[in-house]
């Protein structure tokens, strides 16, 4: 669920998911096309690809379960599809955290007109 994704970003990367990543580069936020602009935008590209592989549930709407164990997010529940969504979200949040030092404000509110190149395959 997108709100849960935002919560995981807050927990793992320590930043507001919607504010920092909702409108970043060519892939963070709704849609996505072109070439990822930097490592953070690539996190979103990989996240989009991960969602694209999920079948049997809706990554943007379905609610999943997770827990925090020794500082780590552990995806759980009986539904393998929802667990997969959680893993996509967790991995993207970890990617954001790992690339905080290269987050570039010039890609925040990045105009779509600069995202016209052909998208690379997942």
Swiss-Prot record:
**InterPro entries reported for this sequence:** PLipase_A2, PLipase_A2_Asp_AS, PLipase_A2_dom, PLipase_A2_dom_sf, PLipase_A2_His_AS
Among the GO biological process terms of this entry, one is: negative regulation of T cell proliferation
UniProt-listed Enzyme Commission number(s): 3.1.1.4
SS bonds (residue pairs) = 26-115, 28-44, 43-95, 49-122, 50-88, 57-81, 75-86
Tell me if Coiled coil is a UniProt keyword of this record.
no
- Which PROSITE patterns does the protein's record reference? PA2_ASP (PS00119), PA2_HIS (PS00118)
Q: Which domain of life is it from?
A: Eukaryota
Q: Report which reactions are catalysed by this protein.
A: a 1,2-diacyl-sn-glycero-3-phosphocholine + H2O = a 1-acyl-sn-glycero-3-phosphocholine + a fatty acid + H(+)
* Cofactor: record remark: Binds 1 Ca(2+) ion.
How would you summarize where this protein is expressed among tissues?
Expressed by the venom gland.
The cofactor(s) it depends on are: Ca(2+)
Q: Which UniProt keywords apply?
A: Calcium, Disulfide bond, Hydrolase, Lipid degradation, Lipid metabolism, Metal-binding, Secreted
State a single Pfam family of this protein: Phospholip_A2_1
Which locations, inside or outside the cell, does it occupy? Secreted
Task: Write out the residues that bind Ca(2+).
Answer: 27, 29, 31, 48
- Transcription regulation listed as a keyword: no
Listed under GO cellular component are: extracellular region
Named from the GO MF annotations, one term is:
calcium ion binding
Which residues act catalytically here?
47, 89
Role played: PLA2 catalyzes the calcium-dependent hydrolysis of the 2-acyl groups in 3-sn-phosphoglycerides.
Q: Which family does it belong to?
A: Belongs to the phospholipase A2 family. Group II subfamily. D49 sub-subfamily.
The protein, known as: Acidic phospholipase A2
